[in-house]
Amino acid sequence: MNHKSKKRIKEAKRSARPELKDSSDWTKHEYCKSFDLSHRSVKDNVERADVQRLSPEEFIQRFEKPYKPVVLLNVEDSWPAREKWTLERLKRKYRNQKFKCGEDNDGYSVKMKMKYYVEYLESTHDDSPLYIFDSSFGEHAKRRKLLEDYQVPLFFRDDLFQFAGEKRRPPYRWFVMGPARSGTGIHIDPLGTSAWNALVQGHKRWCLFPTHTPRELIKVTRDEGGNQQDEAITWFNVIYPRTQQSTWPDEFRPLEILQRPGETVFVPGGWWHVVLNLDTTIAVTQNFASTTNFPIVWHKTVRGRPKLSRKWYRILKQERPDIAAIADKVDLQESTGIASDSSSDSSSSSSSSSSDSDSEADSGSEGDAMTHRRKKRRTGGMMGNGDITSQDDCASKERSSSR
């Protein structure tokens, strides 16, 4: 690795994780030597369903309506990404394009050119390496070509947030790429949205917990995790062993997934989940509001993002009056029964145990780790309309930042 590559990588690491003061902090636990990344460590107890034998109506009835996680097979059979999304080809085609791999203390995106990131990925011994998690690739002239390499699966094309407008809607799609030991800490996706995560290369380890699981049971404390508190590998080192003990409550035992190349995980809204990369992985993930989960998403959006909800409703009234009619019937005083990873939705089932004071973070099914880390370092300001100024994953900052 040449001097320039080392310099760019060092700059990105310093900006994204300022709490790690020197290089030894990144390898303090020596997880690259000690942590078990083998497939045998995963129980893999979530149902799989072949999309070639599953109609959209069956998917809704069997999985989406009952909020049941599932691993879908053969979603990616026709995707060009299966051939195009390799380290070698991505490094060659996008070598000088910058991808987001973190956020600094002020919520600005930390970005790295693909050529430097691949060098980092192939050589790192970091306990929890930097992880490309880029939500703006679809808005960039060159990076948007990634959109041509995959199709939104048939079951997830009911994208109701499109009616909020592209500029105002929360970030919803991410290109995701990282080495072994990278990942995202335990979280619930924002605003009651559900998500799908399609893995093209590598293997991911998932743990999922039902929405009513007490957060204090599954969150790593500062005393336990130190400055690696929010990292996925810390969670698997600290919390996971407890879930396997006889004293762990049966109703809160995790679902586990060993996600393989070509498999797509469906994460229903409200489910806690944590994801660890077992080797180099490349994936795409999207969050969505559908006709099925709309009542809960609407409830949480009105409570957590009032300005967004007003604009969304105006357009729904014009374009989808059937959905606006559903919104009219939602009782905003009733609990949704679906937890939030923040206290903004005061009527949610998790509000009594929540310790966060910010509104719901706009991150994807794998993406809350960076957002939570930033929350602890700064407090977003409130605008007069009740929305948090750090809304939309600091989308306007991210798009204008060249860091």
From Swiss-Prot:
A motif (Nuclear localization signal 5) lies at residues 373-378. A motif (Nuclear localization signal 2) lies at residues 91-95. Residues 12-23, 394-403 have a biased composition (Basic and acidic residues). It catalyses: L-lysyl-[protein] + 2-oxoglutarate + O2 = (5S)-5-hydroxy-L-lysyl-[protein] + succinate + CO2; N(omega),N(omega)'-dimethyl-L-arginyl-[protein] + 2 2-oxoglutarate + 2 O2 = L-arginyl-[protein] + 2 formaldehyde + 2 succinate + 2 CO2; N(omega),N(omega)'-dimethyl-L-arginyl-[protein] + 2-oxoglutarate + O2 = N(omega)-methyl-L-arginyl-[protein] + formaldehyde + succinate + CO2; a 5'-end methyltriphosphate-guanosine-ribonucleotide-snRNA + 2-oxoglutarate + O2 = a 5'-end triphospho-guanosine-ribonucleotide-snRNA + formaldehyde + succinate + CO2 + H(+). Residues 1-11 have a biased composition (Basic residues). Its main location: nucleus. It is an enzyme of class 1 (oxidoreductase). Hydroxylates its own N-terminus; hydroxylation is required for homooligomerization. Binds 1 Fe(2+) ion per subunit. One of its GO terms (biological process) is mRNA processing. It comes from the Eukaryota. It is found in: Nucleus, Nucleoplasm; Nucleus, Nucleolus; Cytoplasm. Keywords: Chromatin regulator, Cytoplasm, Developmental protein, Differentiation, Dioxygenase, Iron, Metal-binding, mRNA processing, mRNA splicing, Nucleus, Oxidoreductase, RNA-binding, Transcription, Transcription regulation. A motif (Nuclear localization signal 1) lies at residues 6-10. Residues 339-356 have a biased composition (Low complexity). Substrate binds at T184, K204. Gene3D superfamilies: 1.20.1280.270, Cupin (2.60.120.650). GO terms for cellular component: cytoplasm; nucleolus; nucleoplasm; nucleus. Its cofactor is Fe(2+). Fe cation binds at H187, D189, H273. 2-oxoglutarate binds at N197, T285. The nuclear localization signal motifs are necessary and sufficient to target it into the nucleus. Dioxygenase that can both act as a arginine demethylase and a lysyl-hydroxylase. Acts as a lysyl-hydroxylase that catalyzes 5-hydroxylation on specific lysine residues of target proteins such as u2af2/u2af65 and LUC7L2. Regulates RNA splicing by mediating 5-hydroxylation of u2af2/u2af65, affecting the pre-mRNA splicing activity of u2af2/u2af65. Hydroxylates its own N-terminus, which is required for homooligomerization. In addition to peptidyl-lysine 5-dioxygenase activity, may act as an RNA hydroxylase, as suggested by its ability to bind single strand RNA. Belongs to the JMJD6 family. This is Bifunctional arginine demethylase and lysyl-hydroxylase JMJD6. The gene is jmjd6.
